[in-house]
Amino acid sequence: MNYGWDYKDVLSKVFKGNPASDLLEADKAEYDSLPDGKVKLRFTTNHDHATEVEPCIQFTNDHGAMAAYVASIFPHGGALIYGSQEVGYPEPINFFKYVPVDWSAKPDVYQEYKKLIGLYNEHPALRKGTMTPYPDNDVLVFEKQDGDEHFLILVNVRNENKTVQIPQSWVGHEVEDEATGKELRLNEAIEMEPFEYLILE
């Protein structure tokens, strides 16, 4: 296992306006170069990046940071949370200096990260399932499947409403968003709010 630096670089560019489908290409390129059974560690910040900028700033706000995290850990790879990102700490942290962090500052952000890591650990399909990509300019769309588990994941990488086409095999299905518990019926397209993500089963 090593850091997925290339994917992280593409992730940053996508959230600044590059096509969401670039992430699908970056994911494939990283994994095509790996031996079977090996993984890349996916992240939105680490000990190097935290000295420069925190995810809640780099990806516009807390909602953008969460969307970026979903786009980072669920296509492939190991999931990294770097200390302080789970509470949305807004300032750079020098790795070599003591920096006090208010761990109770944003309990909603903490709970959201906790939920996502819980889903990652609970569902083999999300953690290591086979991925089927559906390229789009503004929404990252892909399926994950392992055995009987079948998920459709959508991440709006823009800070504005975007409409995206639903893969035909999912149209008409009743699904549940595992992130919120909300149930919905999928039509041919869905409008997503700024930085919204859906983990549908």
Which ranges hold each PLM region?
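Short catalytic/ligand-binding loop motif for oxyanion handling, primarily in non-cytosolic enzymes
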Residues: 50-53, 88-93, 161-163
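Short acidic/histidine-rich active-site segments
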Residues: 80-87
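Conserved, mostly hydrophobic/aromatic
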Residues: 47, 72, 84, 116, ...
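Active-site-proximal helices and loops of the catalytic beta/alpha 8
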Residues: 1-40, 62, 71, 90-115, ...
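Beta-strand-rich binding/interaction modules
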Residues: 161-181
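Carbohydrate-binding surface patches
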Residues: 134-168
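Active-site clefts of carbohydrate-active enzymes
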Residues: 35-59
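C-terminal beta-strand-rich structural cap/linker in extracellular carbohydrate-active enzymes
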Residues: 186-201
